[in-house]
Amino acid sequence: KSLTAKYPKVKALDARGQYVMPGGICAHTHFYGAFARGMSIPGPAPKDFPEILQKLWWPLDRSLDAEAIRYSALVSLVDAIKHGTTTLIDHHASPNCIDGSLDVIADAVDKSGLRGVLCYEVTDRDGLEKANSGINENVRFLKRLSASPHPRLAGTFGLHASLTLSGITLQACRAAAPEGTGFHIHTAEHESDEYDSVSKSEMRVVD
């Protein structure tokens, strides 16, 4: 009653005894993963996470074009709306459609009315040229938002995982990132990530 007295012009809804809660926040997702729902992996079942990457996720992200990126984002955003999630961090990858890919996703987020933090996941798995393209896409999008801020969009700098990133590429990302930029990265998703990190640096992934 105190709220209705304080805001007499605001429309009141009968929640019928249910709770009203703030919107949920998804701190990590891959919109393009919408295409993986119900998808079976050809051949024998993957024995571990690296095989899941090689047999499912990497063939999937290599198949994406601008239209597929747009529709996978829209499907994921509709799903978020239905489940009360209002803010999402999307970790995007489309090795054969890198340039401008974050703009396609940003347009979908804008149309949805939700909030999004977007980045492109840089990786060495597709070669140096595409790693550099991923770096450039992150920087371009961050500069776009800096020059023309959006009330519901933000950017961060995406990295796949330390096991698919060389020290040289990591240094290039750090050098390219605008001052104050945060990084979004997979960490310790499987033992192989830990072993790779220890062999490269004698430190675990999060050390």
Task: Map each language-model feature to its residues.
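Histidine-rich, glycine-flanked metal-binding segment
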Residues: 1-21
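Well-ordered alpha-helical segments embedded in enzymatic catalytic cores
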Residues: 2, 72-76, 137, 204
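Di-metal (Zn2+ and/or Mg2+/Mn2+) metal-binding site signature of metallo-dependent hydrolases
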Residues: 18-40
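Hydrophobic "anchor" residues on beta-strands that sit immediately upstream
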Residues: 24, 86, 182
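Residue-level signal for inorganic ion chemistry
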Residues: 28, 84, 186
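Active-site gating loops and adjacent loop-to-helix segments of metal-dependent hydrolytic enzymes
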Residues: 35-69, 125-127, 139, 189-207
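Divalent metal-binding segments
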Residues: 43-101, 161-169
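Metal-coordinating catalytic core of metallo-dependent amide/deamination hydrolases
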Residues: 92-207
